Amino acid sequence: MTVTDTELTTLAASHDIITLGMAADDARRDRHAMRATFVRVLDVDAAPGGPVVAPPSAGEVRIVGVPTSVAAACARVREVVAAAGTTPVSGFSLDDLEQLAGSEKIPLRALLEDLHRAGLEQIAEAPVDQLSDPRLSIENLKLAGLSLARLTVHALPSTDIPALYRQVVALQQQVGIIRAFAPLPRVVNPAVPTTGYDDVRRVALARLFVSNIPTIQVDWSLYGAKLAQVALTVGADDLDAVSPDDTAAEGRRRAPLEEVRRNIRAASLEPTERDGRFDIRAQ
């Protein structure tokens, strides 16, 4: 389904969530048919020396937190890569690495190349509203041999969502390597309060506006099963950060894998597990 600029402007100004959601769902189905993907992620702390036990169920091992130095970041990458085996390893937020490069007075590209040599495959996230120069930083990431797991929004900078999404479209036109965009903010900006209605609307508008990024993603661990299920009906096609825990202490139906599959099916879609490289895992 192709939506014209005039139609986008009308939809963005509308409070008719049903019409907006239907248009976004049509756009998602044109790209992904009936499939919705999800990835099970093991988070490990950025501090070197911490335990890393990567279960076979994890499709991605993600290093989270702010490294204290380039040396500490590289040391942690080597530890995690060794423990992860063949499981893809991502790590860090690109804005934190910008600041680290500045504090150590080295080029960002040099820092990223060090991480790549240590074994890192992907930078875990790049918050478009936090980076000092999103295009330059992502270009440096690409030149360093790394990929980007997802473009994110840290805290909505304003209520002008279409303007933000047009910025994302322009960024992808410049860099061309963004595989997934997670439009819902990681933290709440007190100046831009959010509701469930707003979140659903933002997901739908993201799918309609950001036509040059394949995947619109929702963080399962951050936003929960209910919003994730609704988001899948209005344009989202991927669920990030599902727990790799296979235990069923509260019963099989409450186990993370069964719960995410059930929610995807409830959205009338086909659950498909992927890994951190977006390769489909054996079902």
Residues covered by each model-derived region:
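Auxiliary Fe-S-binding modules of radical SAM enzymes
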Residues: 1-31, 55-57, 70, 83-87, ...
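N-terminal capping/lid subdomain adjacent to the active-site entrance of alpha/beta enzymes
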Residues: 26, 33-53
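Short linear capping/connector segments at secondary-structure termini
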Residues: 41, 153-154, 183-187
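Conserved Radical SAM active-site core
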Residues: 45-159
